[in-house]
């Protein structure tokens, strides 16, 4: 999405990067507030006091989000022999408070956790249309990442390295995970 189309003070749709206009009764955005209010919306949508407030807004915490296509369900060692029904909720990779604390400390030093806190959902266990027969999709919500990396690199430069590290982290708990990943975004 390149821009949110507004009319009469209301969102009416979006303009995509390839120039298509898509109209909608409702537009939802899952982006940083500054991206939404300073880049996607027309600047005239905010009064000057609100513009100043959003310009002064600072956040440092971020998350790393990715989706993976899987050839099979992860086989977590802690859930050996468990069926698909055990994947219908969230699976958390955060085995202890110390693990979570270490993830936070890593982030303060290098910009991301060496062993991140990961929340995994496998929606294909409930909606079979999301993946081919026998396959699955998983959504990974990973915590303890800085928005701006302390060494000056951009997230575009390190995103593949970090995605590999996230997959390796899950593989420590579900040894078939890495080999089952057939696609990722």
What is each model feature region?
Residues 2-131:
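Mid-domain catalytic core of redox enzymes
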Residues 116-185:
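FAD-dependent oxidoreductase catalytic-site/capping-region signature
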């Amino acid at each position: 999405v390149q821009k949110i189309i507004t009319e009469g003070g209301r969102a009416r749709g979006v303009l995509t990067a390839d120039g298509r206009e898509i109209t909608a009764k409702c537009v939802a955005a899952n982006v940083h507030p500054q991206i939404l209010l300073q880049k996607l919306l027309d600047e005239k949508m905010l009064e000057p006091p609100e513009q100043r407030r959003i310009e002064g807004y600072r956040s440092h915490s971020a998350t790393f989000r990715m989706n993976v296509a899987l050839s099979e369900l992860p086989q977590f060692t802690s859930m050996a022999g468990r069926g698909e029904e055990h994947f219908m909720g969230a699976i958390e990779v955060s085995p202890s408070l110390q693990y979570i604390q270490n993830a936070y400390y890593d982030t303060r030093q290098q910009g991301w956790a060496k062993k991140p806190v990961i929340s995994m959902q496998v929606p294909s266990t409930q909606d079979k249309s999301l993946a081919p027969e026998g396959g699955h999709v998983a959504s990974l919500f990973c915590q303890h990442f800085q928005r701006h990396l302390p060494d000056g690199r951009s997230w575009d430069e390190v995103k593949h390295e970090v995605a590999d590290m996230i997959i390796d982290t899950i593989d420590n708990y579900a040894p078939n995970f890495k080999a089952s990943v057939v696609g990722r975004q």
